[in-house]
């Protein structure tokens, strides 16, 4: 038996064995004999026996209750980050046929199409193991730009459209706002927003698109206008291209600032640690916006990018802003990426989903380029405007205490953001999650079978719970109603607070 199994076995209460019952019986007789020898009234003897009987009855009740999962907390699913149900049908169609749209704008001949997988593979090396050889304006090269759009832009649209369609409305710009897309490339973010949020199509938005590659922005604007033309009832957003690096001045203050994968590229081009870089990024973001500006930052789900976002999160909170997602609290980040990016095997904040629903043609292209994707991962941060001081101070002291307290009371609710795939602990399904308690280990009552599948037992009595035929997934936000706060333990391996759910 492994050390981990031994550890988790402590939390499984078992009925007393025959040997244990006999041992208890002997102890009880000994107590009786000892009591009879003491020169005390018969009342005291009866009291001792009564206490002993009550203690044993309580222990039996605890074991009985635990076996019925009465210690497990009820919960319900508030939202998911990657549900395909929220992606508009016209967006799904465009994603499926994205290669045809690109071909209609910048056509390749048969020979170039045949060479495309190899060109994609070469570009992949420049973005990863050979990035030190990559030119800053690499997307100005037509071959590399074509490869990038037909592969990376397509995958990024799949990732971003999935995320954007599931974020709350307050994460996005409002009517007539000035918006800034930093490191815009071929306008991937703008296209993803148009696809994922149909309600934004009717808004008159002005977009400043900032990038060092003018060629990629021109290509991206052609792509966006072609896609927007499929909804002729809406006027396309105004696009203002600005050639320059992050920090280049724009003419107006932005009410909405967004970037995708930009910070990761900047980190790759610098030897400075994220702690130093994040300070510079924050100052520049603040310079571009106002106190009312919203931010939406999306990066690859790698430790260093996660660390950068965590540092920015801290600064945004210190400035009085609110985090819309993914954080279910405003406490210190328990998965800040510091130990992970420095080489330790620690959890960092990132979310993933299966690519089985990705366009078939994109999956086939990935296989030809020998870059198959089974999962798509990302880290992100959605930030709203600074909190009004009067509004902030109007909260009662009791409300503030509840928000900031790490102590759980019976009947309180605890929001948890699932931040891992499921794994097995003591033959039960478990997940890592983020909550105001810090790193949290969510244990369900689903048992693992020998074939690796998950079975759910005895849930007919708990119809109010989430449909147990569908497992929780990375990115899900759940609200747990606390029944028994006193029994919460800490995971020996990670220190995570253990929360059992039914």
Show the residue positions of the predicted features:
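Class I SAM-dependent methyltransferase Rossmann-like catalytic core
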Residues: 134-170
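Conserved SAM-binding loop of SAM-dependent methyltransferases across substrates and taxa
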Residues: 186-202
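Conserved beta-strand signature within the Rossmann-like core of class I S-adenosyl-L-methionine
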Residues: 289-299
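Class I S-adenosyl-L-methionine
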Residues: 306-314, 318-387
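C-terminal lobe and adjacent flexible extensions of AdoMet/dcAdoMet transferase-like proteins
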Residues: 355-502
């Amino acid at each position: 038996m492994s050390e981990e199994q031994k550890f988790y076995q402590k939390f499984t209460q078992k009925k007393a064995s025959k040997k244990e019952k006999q041992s208890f019986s002997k102890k009880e007789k000994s107590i009786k004999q000892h009591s009879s020898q003491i020169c005390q009234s018969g009342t005291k003897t009866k009291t001792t026996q009564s206490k002993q009987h009550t203690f044993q009855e309580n222990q039996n009740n605890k074991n009985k209750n635990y076996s019925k999962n009465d210690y497990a907390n009820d919960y319900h699913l508030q939202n998911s980050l990657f549900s395909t149900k929220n992606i508009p049908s016209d967006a799904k169609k465009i994603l499926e046929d994205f290669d045809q749209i690109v071909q209609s704008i910048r056509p390749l001949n048969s020979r170039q199409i045949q060479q495309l997988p190899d060109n994609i593979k070469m570009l992949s090396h420049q973005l990863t193991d050979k990035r030190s050889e990559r030119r800053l304006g690499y997307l100005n090269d037509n071959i590399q730009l074509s490869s990038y759009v037909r592969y990376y832009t397509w995958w990024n649209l799949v990732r971003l459209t999935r995320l954007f369609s599931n974020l709350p409305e307050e994460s996005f710009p409002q009517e007539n706002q000035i918006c800034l897309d930093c490191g815009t490339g071929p306008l991937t973010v703008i296209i993803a927003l148009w696809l994922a949020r149909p309600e934004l199509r009717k808004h008159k938005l002005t977009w400043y698109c900032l990038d060092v590659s003018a060629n990629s922005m021109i290509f991206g604007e052609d792509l966006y206008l072609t896609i927007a033309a499929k909804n002729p009832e809406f006027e396309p957003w105004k696009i203002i291209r600005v050639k320059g690096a992050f920090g280049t001045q724009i003419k107006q203050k932005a009410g909405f600032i967004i970037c995708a994968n930009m910070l990761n590229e900047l980190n790759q081009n610098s030897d400075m640690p994220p702690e130093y870089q994040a300070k510079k990024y924050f100052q520049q973001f603040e310079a571009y916006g106002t106190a009312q500006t919203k931010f939406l930052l999306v990066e690859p789900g790698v430790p260093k990018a996660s660390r950068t976002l965590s540092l920015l999160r801290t600064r945004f909170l210190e400035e009085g802003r609110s985090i819309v997602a993914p954080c279910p609290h405003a406490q210190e980040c328990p998965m800040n990426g510091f130990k992970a990016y420095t080489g330790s095997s620690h959890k960092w904040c990132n979310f993933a989903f299966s690519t089985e629903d990705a366009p078939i043609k994109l999956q086939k292209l990935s296989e030809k380029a020998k870059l198959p994707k089974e999962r798509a991962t990302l880290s992100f941060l959605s930030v709203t405007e600074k909190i009004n001081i009067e509004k902030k101070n109007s909260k009662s002291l009791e409300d503030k205490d509840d928000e900031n307290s790490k102590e759980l009371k019976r009947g309180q609710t605890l929001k948890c953001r699932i931040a891992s795939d499921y794994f097995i602990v003591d033959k039960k399904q478990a997940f890592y999650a983020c909550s105001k308690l810090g790193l949290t280990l969510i244990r369900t009552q689903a048992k693992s079978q020998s074939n690796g599948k998950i079975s759910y037992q005895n849930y007919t009595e708990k119809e109010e719970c989430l449909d147990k035929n569908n497992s929780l997934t990375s990115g899900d936000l759940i609200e747990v109603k606390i029944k028994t706060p006193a029994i919460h333990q800490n995971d020996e391996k990670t220190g995570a607070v253990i929360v059992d759910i039914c």
